[in-house]
Amino acid sequence: MDRRRFIKGSMAMAAVCGTSGIASLFSQAAFAADSDIADGQTQRFDFSILQSMAHDLAQTAWRGAPRPLPDTLATMTPQAYNSIQYDAEKSLWHNVENRQLDAQFFHMGMGFRRRVRMFSVDPATHLAREIHFRPELFKYNDAGVDTKQLEGQSDLGFAGFRVFKAPELARRDVVSFLGASYFRAVDDTYQYGLSARGLAIDTYTDSKEEFPDFTAFWFDTVKPGATTFTVYALLDSASITGAYKFTIHCEKSQVIMDVENHLYARKDIKQLGIAPMTSMFSCGTNERRMCDTIHPQIHDSDRLSMWRGNGEWICRPLNNPQKLQFNAYTDNNPKGFGLLQLDRDFSHYQDIMGWYNKRPSLWLEPRNKWGKGTIGLMEIPTTGETLDNIVCFWQPEKAVKAGDEFAFQYRLYWSAQPPVHCPLARVMATRTGMGGFPEGWAPGEHYPEKWARRFAVDFVGGDLKAAAPKGIEPVITLSSGEAKQIEILYIEPIDGYRIQFDWYPTSDSTDPVDMRMYLRCQGDAISETWLYQYFPPASDKRQYVDDRVMS
């Protein structure tokens, strides 16, 4: 949790780590890509070479934690770190004619201690040359860095990189890779939100979570006028190595990433998380416990959406539980899943610092057969917006043993809306509150005599209006308790229907209640499936307290 909190805070500041065992794997050649800042010796490079590097690296022992940074970097505050700026005149593709993209590097420092090596590649000749660290690549401003401590440290490396797109070259980045294997992108709002990672290991097991690192990147030199670039990455950790290829399309309204990886297990792994996503949910329309602020909602994402291999669409609203929760949803060759931020109305957030209404959704589309496995969702209790408390990933069914090799291909869409939608009625919003009284009498002259919790789920789209005269039937399944006072209400402002029911406990258990609902008309499903997890209070809290003073 400490690592996740650090990455969250550090990336937020950066938005306004030494490589083990790869040096001996490089071969040297003759000439490299056209980049003024690339100063290393030339070496042959392509994706097959990177796969061989990762394969061979997995046969060697992991060399452990990164070496200490110079004191002037290790003791930096976030404010000081954020004041270091890369010199835009020395950007990676500064000399490319009619460039639409450009790349800059993040400085080492603060908690970013893992050395990341950078290489420029000429895609025509497949020759690469390393870009070594040197202080003149940066403007230190008032960061207070003693640059004398950095002299001669060409092997210091970088912390990560970010990419800019015209007309905002050197001003507003659209892609960022920084910290462990974390990376992010934006849509046309230029507002960062949730993150992705290269890999997750033992996120929810009895072992300590492992955070693999991207330890080196190779950049194909972009073509003049191009808005697509390709970057390759070497991933390394105690348990696994990997070769990654990212083909990143920086479009007008979204960023699309085609990802291909080849993974090589060093040792047995209890839980391997493929294509992990990391987000934040503090409070929303369904979960008000932590919303005692001026903001009605605080979240990077509001739901997990899943398009299962059998064609079923599922909407799972996110929670901020009082106790850590992990749920695994079984599937076979999923068609897609993602953490979505579909509510884009500023008035629902009232936040001029976080701008949560502008944050992108992230949708994943497998590009090869993933087989059997589960979509894992972990929800961590949080008191606020500074901790990423939502983690989602694909876990293959097959246990991972030392020496195993895997290959996954997938596409990531960073956009306001996912590229595909359920053709049936979709969940627009989930709300919860006091139950046990007739709608329109909230709660009347006195509190209800019997405690209950009300759930209201709004559905829009599909064939709802055509189905209404024939009869819409909510199909509700509960793991415990009873659903009563079920109502179907037409909501004119959204041109949709609200399904409302009260949940009544049938025991004193405080175990999470799994709820499932979809809409049916004449035997056919006419909506996506709504999944929810409710956490009932202790039995002595299931009462309404009238604290009014009438005299």
Swiss-Prot record:
GO biological process, one term: beta-glucan biosynthetic process
Membrane-crossing segments per the record: none
Annotated family: Belongs to the OpgD/OpgG family.
Name the UniProt record assigns to this protein: Glucans biosynthesis protein D
Organism name: Shigella boydii serotype 18 (strain CDC 3083-94 / BS512)
Signal sequence annotation: 1-32
UniProt-listed NCBIfam families: TAT_signal_seq
Cellular component, GO, one term: outer membrane-bounded periplasmic space
Pfam families for this protein: MdoG
